[in-house]
Amino acid sequence: LKLFITGPTYIRDDVKEAAKLPEFGHRDAENDLRFVPIQENLIKLAGAGDKYVPALLLGSGSTSMEASVRSLVADDETILNVSVGAFGDMYYNIAASNGKKAENLKFDYGQAMDLNVLEDKLRVMKPDVVSFTHNETSTGVTNDMKAACELIRKHGAMPLVDGVSIFGGADIDLENSGAAIYCTATQKALALSAGFGIAFISEEAEEKAARVTNKGHHHDLTKHMDKARKHQTLTTPNTTLVNQMWFQLDRIVNEEGIQNRFDRHIEMRGMVEQWVDGLNGFEMFAPEGHRSVTMSSVVCPAGVTVAQLKGGVKEALRGEGYLMDPGYGKLNAALEKEGQRQIIRIGHMGDIMPDMLVEYLDALAVELNKL
């Protein structure tokens, strides 16, 4: 099946072949031949300059997010989470489940964070730390990371950012973002299998983590930084994925070109917008100016049901060789209960090419027009 979901994502054949490269010892000199270029290319892809060290954490994006909370929020501090969707809520739940003094500032699904509302909350709550989502996978909304971080710092708080579903598909200019830590993963726009959470850790974050207690072991950023500076992981990594990551990042940086990759994602967002304009009764869910370049959410006409999308459209497209995303389950269930219109999601991240997207959109349109 060709995956047009929002993760995991399509993996190129040559990246799959890289899995056949020889295994190696993660404490052996051979390890450096993989991890040094991996870290160098991650820094280039992030535009991180010399302000961040990328650390690879065994797990997924939520692993790095939990490490950010456990290592950067002291027991006597407060954390405000800003949510524009399901994965923003997850960041809050991570903090709450770890016993942090957390509050969740929620915005309506399909909307970006309102900085004026955020500033009002910052004035009243005076949190020590603020976490938020750069790109909300459940809704296709992208927040203005730089503006949010600037506002958060204006009020004396430390910004923690979840960039799981946008990193590798957009220019995040991390060096000038203001983020204390930027959390992402392998299985989205990097077009690799799941297996690593990636944390871009600033000196500021490292210094604070050294003062915070009760960090656990695998969520202790100071331990990860110690190994990252040696071009290693804290515990034994999936060396097959490391080989693929080494190959893929080199290909992105030195073959495709970073800016070309970013431009391709912008082009595909525009393709979806144009496609939606040609469908009767469908519209983009996210507001213009805050639409993700890696995935799109599309509002269906009134009367379309979850059952039609999951049992009808999705299964019809499966028969044609595509895995369709009928929308984020919890969100669509809530929308249906409230009598609101359903949304579908279209993943166009990583190594999905424009010609692949055209073919999929044509097939998807045929099925949607039957509703």
Language model: regions and residue ranges:
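Conserved N-terminal alpha-helix of the aminotransferase class I/II PLP-enzyme fold
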Residues: 18-64, 86, 90-94
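Active-site phosphate-binding strand-loop segment of PLP-dependent enzymes
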Residues: 113-168, 181
